[in-house]
Amino acid sequence: MGCTLSAEDKAAVERSKMIDRNLREDGEKAAKEVKLLLLGAGESGKSTIVKQMKIIHEDGYSEDECKQYKVVVYSNTIQSIIAIIRAMGRLKIDFGEAARADDARQLFVLAGSAEEGVMTSELAGVIKRLWRDGGVQACFSRSREYQLNDSASYYLNDLDRISQTNYIPTQQDVLRTRVKTTGIVETHFTFKELYFKMFDVGGQRSERKKWIHCFEGVTAIIFCVALSDYDLVLAEDEEMNRMHESMKLFDSICNNKWFTDTSIILFLNKKDLFEEKIKRSPLTICYPEYTGSNTYEEAAAYIQCQFEDLNRRKDTKEVYTHFTCATDTKNVQFVFDAVTDVIIKNNLKECGLY
């Protein structure tokens, strides 16, 4: 009879080959689809990272899209100057010039026009005079004692440009805008032959209950921490230090049983703000046991250790840490390139292709 196969056996062999081929194709397809979850406390820079993905991987914001951000730029600018003026009352700081009190009253009267995306020359003049005032600057230098947008000085220092009638926000202006994320924002893009699905979820405590259904099938978690938050308290709980809240949250994510096989990427963000702040605000505000110097390198390395030490599975799970400045496109591009290489390697391993 020899080794000839019956028609039935041949069909079985073909079926087996087809199953193997399908399994491999499914594995390759899974390896090519990447689900990224962006987590972190409120105002840690998650949404800015998402905006950078659009700039880096999707040709950025069109002129029409930029125009839509004009109202947000104006709103952020006015919210910032109003926050400073209100804090002056609480901190008992007087205006450098008495006439500025009239400007402050005018500010509250005129502020409404900016909500429609219009900044009148009268309103711009009022804000400029207030921002130049010695008392306002003294209050701004104490911004850790109240809630203020990171982008406050960026917009207020550039009022001449942003108050022009023909003003169109730049990509950088868009990156600097702050809108509280509610719910889940999903972004898709392709990079290095991978199809990315990135989910940005609100960081405030009230938003966290919405995270849970995003967790299934996650390839990697990018956890954002604002380094510059070490001397600040939460917007939603003024008793809680923001860095301590971040550590608590990172601990619960990093050691969660659902994420045993999920890559954890730690973005220690706002390194530019941290570098400036550490010169005048000691790290002991957050970590009383810290005995090192208040230099960027030593203080940043200490914070990195505090987070990495929370990983209770060091022997089997690695935390990939990067120092980032989410508003710097080149920095984010460089870091995300390195992150993608780690994801490719880990993803292929999981699918048995590496």
Curated annotation (Swiss-Prot):
GO annotations of cellular component type: centrosome; cytoplasm; endoplasmic reticulum membrane; Golgi apparatus; Golgi membrane; heterotrimeric G-protein complex; midbody; plasma membrane
Major site of localization recorded for this protein: cytoplasm
Pfam families tied to this protein: G-alpha
Effect on the protein of changing residue 40 to R: Fails to bind GTP. Prevents endothelin-mediated activation of GNAQ. Results in increased frequency of developmental defects compared to wild-type when ectopically expressed in Xenopus laevis embryos
Highest rank taxon of the organism: Eukaryota
Tissue expression notes: Ubiquitous.
Entry binding sites for GTP: 42-48, 150-151, 175-181, 201, 203, 269-270, 272-273, 325-327
CDD domains attached to this UniProt entry: G-alpha (cd00066)
Positions of the UniProt region annotated as G2 motif: 173-181
A biological process from GO: positive regulation of vascular associated smooth muscle cell proliferation
Keyword list, A-Z: Cell cycle, Cell division, Cell membrane, Cytoplasm, Cytoskeleton, GTP-binding, Lipoprotein, Magnesium, Membrane, Metal-binding, Myristate, Nucleotide-binding, Palmitate, Transducer
GO molecular function: G protein-coupled receptor binding; G protein-coupled serotonin receptor binding; G-protein beta/gamma-subunit complex binding; GDP binding; GTP binding; GTPase activating protein binding; GTPase activity; metal ion binding
UniProt membrane topology term: Lipid-anchor
UniProt family annotation: Belongs to the G-alpha family. G(i/o/t/z) subfamily.
Assembly, per entry: Heterotrimeric G proteins are composed of 3 units; alpha, beta and gamma. The alpha subunit contains the guanine nucleotide binding site. GTP binding causes dissociation of the heterotrimer, liberating the individual subunits so that they can interact with downstream effector proteins. Forms a complex with CCDC88A/GIV and EGFR which leads to enhanced EGFR signaling and triggering of cell migration; ligand stimulation is required for recruitment of GNAI3 to the complex. Interacts (inactive GDP-bound form) with CCDC88A/GIV (via GBA motif); the interaction leads to activation of GNAI3.
PANTHER family, sorted: GTP-BINDING PROTEIN ALPHA SUBUNIT, GUANINE NUCLEOTIDE-BINDING PROTEIN G(I) SUBUNIT ALPHA-3
Identification of the protein by name: Guanine nucleotide-binding protein G(i) subunit alpha-3
Origin organism lineage: Eukaryota, Metazoa, Chordata, Craniata, Vertebrata
